[in-house]
Design a protein with these regions (language model features):
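Helix-breaking motifs and short loop linkers at transmembrane-helix boundaries and internal kinks
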Residues: 37-39, 71, 92-98, 109, ...
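Helix-to-loop junctions at the C-terminal end of transmembrane segments
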Residues: 60-71, 263-276
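Juxtamembrane intracellular "pre-TM" segments in multi-pass secondary transporters
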Residues: 1-2, 186-217
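Cytoplasmic helix-loop-helix junction between adjacent transmembrane helices
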Residues: 102-143
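Helix-loop-helix hairpin linking two adjacent transmembrane segments in secondary transporters
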Residues: 98, 136-181
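Conserved MFS/SLC helix-loop-helix module at the cytosolic interface between two early adjacent transmembrane helices
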Residues: 58-97
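Paired small-residue
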Residues: 82, 86-89, 97-105, 306-312
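A late C-terminal transmembrane helix in Major Facilitator Superfamily
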Residues: 328-366, 375
Length: 400
């Protein structure tokens, strides 16, 4: 697990996986400015984020099985090319309707570089090794939440919000170059020959009948829904409610993202020592407890920026252990249909995230309360689901 090829693969897959998140995170500091420039309200601007998540989810149900049938690289070419076209459209959008439409197109392409790398991880490794590679991949692509908002705020200051989408377009082109010159095909021709549309439908049916897969996917979905709530609301809360500048907001966002990333890097080592189920159980308990504490403080009138950042730092650290471990556990039993499994998992998680963003938009009131309450609710749901899912399957013992 320490050879150069392992690290090189993590770097390439991480950079590809970062393409979609960059399209989300880089424009977060610009959300209030976009609303002003396009003469629209907060909820309408949030719909541009929801549109991306919806199409991002839909596309995964296509790219995952396609990567089983045609190999891992062709869907990457098609998806990233579509992503670049959508990004250019966003840069040229004359109003909020066109921005939402091109964000939808951007998301349709952006699904490929997020779902295919997960399938490649399963092609190459299982268990603790897969967890280690998934965590390293997350380290690379999760640099996006740290750097992208800061880069976005600098671009806004220098050239305005539209320039953000020109930069994102260039990132997509770089992704095409990476696929062409640095990525090897990991889906053998013999396995591709065994895959077709009918087998994909059978694979989906098999996965939907697997309560362990569905349970783990749901845990990850509600865990990520907490982060989606933060993505959709944090710029308005921190900039408009707490009075931060876009650059200050990007730094505050980076602090919490760094916690998520940093802790995730211990997932592989902890899995080797304690086993995946125990890691998920403890991490979800800590995540839910910290988010409930945050909501309680806020509703008790302790509405300070420092307490919020501090508690989110702790909570997102726990979440950093949940995401890679639940992904690996969900895919471990389905290596022969890893593309379909990865696609279905990603689709279900993102659809839930989009629905949560839409619902949360109704409760926006200019304060932090809807955001912290929403995060606490989905965190508790994730913890409850873990009690059912992990309790319905024989406990995995830690390696000796």
């Amino acid at each position: 697990m320490t050879n150069p090829k392992f690290f090189r693969m993590a770097l390439v897959l991480g950079l590809l996986s970062a393409i979609g998140p960059f399209a989300i995170d880089m424009y977060l500091p610009a959300l209030p400015a976009i609303g002003v420039a396009l003469h629209t309200d907060t909820h309408a601007v949030q719909m541009s984020l929801m549109a991306f998540f919806v199409s991002f989810a839909i596309s995964q149900i296509v790219y995952g099985p396609a990567s089983d049938i045609f190999g891992r690289k062709p869907p990457l070419y098609a998806g990233i090319a579509l992503f670049v076209i959508g990004s250019i459209g966003c840069a040229l959008a004359p109003d909020i309707v066109w921005l939402i439409a091109f964000r939808f197109l951007q998301g349709l392409g952006g699904g490929a570089p997020i779902v295919v790398p997960r399938a490649i991880v399963r092609d190459l490794h299982t268990g603790a090794e897969a967890t280690q590679l998934m965590a390293m991949l997350m380290l690379v692509f999760s640099v996006s939440p740290i750097l992208a908002p800061l880069i976005g705020s600098l671009i806004i200051d220098a050239a305005g919000w539209r320039a953000i989408f020109w930069v994102v377009s260039a990132i997509g082109v770089i992704g095409l170059v990476l696929v062409a010159f640095t990525l090897e095909e990991t889906r053998p021709a013999a396995q591709r020959a065994q895959s077709d549309v009918a087998s994909t439908l059978r694979a989906f049916a098999l996965l939907l009948r697997d309560p362990h897969f569905i349970g783990l996917t749901a845990i990850g979905a509600f865990g990520m829904a907490a982060f989606f709530i933060y993505l959709a609301n944090s710029s308005f809360v921190l900039i408009e409610h707490y009075g931060l500048t876009p650059r200050q907001y990007s730094l505050a966002f980076a602090v919490n993202a760094a916690s998520f990333i940093g802790v995730s890097q211990f997932a592989g080592k902890l899995a080797e020592r304690y086993g995946l189920p125990r890691i998920v159980s403890v991490a979800l308990l800590g995540f839910a407890a910290s988010m409930v504490v945050l909501a309680t403080l806020n509703f008790a009138g302790i509405d300070g920026l420092a307490p919020m950042i501090a508690v989110l730092l702790i909570g997102f650290g726990f979440l950093g252990l949940v995401v890679p471990t639940t992904s690996v556990m969900a895919l471990d039993d389905h290596g022969e249909i890893a593309g379909a499994a990865s696609a279905l998992m990603g689709t279900l998680q993102l659809v839930l995230g989009a629905l949560v963003i839409a619902v949360m938009g109704v409760f926006v009131d200019g304060t932090a309360r809807p955001m912290v309450a929403g995060i606490a609710v989905v965190a508790v749901i994730a913890w409850v689901l873990s009690r059912w899912t992990l309790g319905s399957r024989p406990r995995e013992t830690a390696p000796a």
